C-alpha cells in the first residue's frame, strides 16, 4: 500500500470523513483528498499529527507489508452500516498487518491444523453435534470445559484479533492470501458471548453444510456443542427437566464459559426441557432483561496471547526496539521492565 492508501485506510478505521479529518488538522478536504490519491506526500510533521488523530503509530504509514483479504462474513445483532463495515474492515487489516510483520521479523510460520472437510460434513442437527465432538477429539480437548477458546484457535493456526468496533458487531471471519483463516471479535463483549462468537465463527470455517441445513443455524448449534458437548449437558442438567432455575444457569455459565441464554437454548434444543418450559423461561429472561445483560458477575474476557509473545520474544532477542514493540502491539506498552525483572 502507498502512503496515500494507508492514510485513507487509517481514516476509515477511525470513522472519519475527509472533511472531518481536514477539520481536525486545520486543512482543507481537498488537501486530504490529494494526500490519499498520492498527488501530494504530506511532510513528516503532518504525518505525526495525522497519526495522533487517527490513532495509529507514524510507522504505520511506511509499513511495507500489506494483505489481501477475502470478503468477510460478519456476525452482528443487526446489519452494519456501510461506514461501520468499512471501519471494522480497516481496523482488522491494520491489526493483521502488525501480526504478520512480527511473524516475518522472527521467521515464524504458523502451521494450520484444521480437521478435514469430511470430518465436518453435516446434513442434520445430530451431524452437527457429531462434528463438534470430532473436532474436540482431533484437537485433544476431551469433554471438559475449554479453559481458553482463543488459545485453542491460535494453537491450531487461526489468527485471532480483538478490535474496537460498534456495539452491534460481534465477530467476523475471513481468509487472507486465500488460505489462512482469521477471526476478529469485538473488544467490548462479555467473555461468555465472546467465547460463543469465536466458536460460532469456527463453525463457519469448518462446517461443510449439506441437505438444505441453514448455515447460520448450523454454526450456532456447532458453537453450543463445541463449548458444551451434549453428553456433558445431560450430565449437568439431567435427561429431562420440568424446570431449571436461573441460579443453575448462572453457575453453569461460570463453569463452562457459555452464557445463561445459550444454556437455556441448549437445554431446549437437546430436549431436556419442553417447548412450553423454554417459552416460560424465555419470558422470565425477557422480563428481567437478562438477554441484554445477564445477572451477577460477568465472565472475564479472553485475550489473544500469540502476537504479544512473539513481540516480547523479538524484544528480548534485540531484534526490535521498545518503540517498535509498542508500535507492533498497537500502542500498548510491551512491559520490558517486567521481562527484565525475571
Report the location of each language-model feature.
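Active-site hotspot residues in diverse enzymes, especially metal/ion-binding acidic/histidine motifs
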Residues: 1-342
Amino acid at each position: 500500500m502507498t502512503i496515500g492508501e494507508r492514510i485513507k485506510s487509517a481514516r476509515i478505521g477511525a470513522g472519519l470523513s475527509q472533511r472531518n479529518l481536514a477539520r481536525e488538522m486545520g486543512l482543507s478536504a481537498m488537501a486530504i483528498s490529494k494526500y490519499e490519491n498520492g498527488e501530494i506526500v504530506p511532510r513528516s510533521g503532518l504525518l505525526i499529527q495525522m497519526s495522533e488523530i487517527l490513532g495509529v503509530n507514524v510507522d504505520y504509514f511506511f509499513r511495507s507489508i500489506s494483505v489481501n483479504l477475502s470478503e468477510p462474513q460478519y456476525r452482528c445483532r443487526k446489519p452494519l452500516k456501510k461506514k461501520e463495515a468499512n471501519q471494522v474492515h480497516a481496523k482488522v487489516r491494520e491489526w493483521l498487518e502488525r501480526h504478520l510483520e512480527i511473524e516475518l521479523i522472527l521467521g515464524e510460520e504458523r502451521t494450520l491444523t484444521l480437521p478435514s472437510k469430511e470430518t465436518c460434513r453435516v446434513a442434520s442437527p445430530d451431524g452437527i453435534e457429531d462434528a463438534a465432538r470430532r473436532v474436540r477429539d482431533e484437537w485433544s480437548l476431551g469433554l471438559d470445559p475449554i479453559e481458553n477458546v482463543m488459545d485453542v484457535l491460535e494453537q491450531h493456526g487461526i489468527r485471532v484479533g480483538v478490535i474496537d468496533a460498534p456495539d452491534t458487531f460481534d465477530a467476523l471471519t475471513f481468509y487472507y492470501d486465500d488460505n489462512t483463516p482469521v477471526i476478529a471479535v469485538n473488544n467490548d463483549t462479555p467473555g461468555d458471548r465472546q467465547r460463543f462468537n469465536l466458536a460460532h465463527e469456527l463453525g463457519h470455517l469448518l462446517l461443510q453444510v449439506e441437505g438444505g441445513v441453514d448455515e447460520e443455524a448450523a454454526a450456532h448449534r456447532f458453537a453450543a456443542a463445541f463449548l458444551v458437548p451434549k453428553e456433558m449437558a445431560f450430565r449437568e442438567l439431567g435427561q429431562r427437566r420440568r424446570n431449571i432455575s436461573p441460579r443453575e444457569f448462572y453457575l453453569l455459565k461460570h463453569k463452562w464459559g457459555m452464557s445463561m441464554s445459550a444454556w437455556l437454548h441448549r437445554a431446549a434444543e437437546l430436549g431436556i426441557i419442553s417447548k412450553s418450559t423454554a417459552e416460560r423461561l424465555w419470558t422470565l429472561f425477557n422480563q428481567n432483561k437478562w438477554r441484554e445483560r445477564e445477572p451477577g458477575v460477568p465472565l472475564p474476557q479472553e485475550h489473544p496471547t500469540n502476537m504479544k509473545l512473539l513481540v516480547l520474544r523479538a524484544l528480548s532477542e534485540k531484534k526490535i526496539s521498545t518503540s517498535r514493540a509498542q508500535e507492533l502491539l498497537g500502542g500498548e506498552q510491551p512491559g520490558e521492565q517486567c521481562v527484565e525483572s525475571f
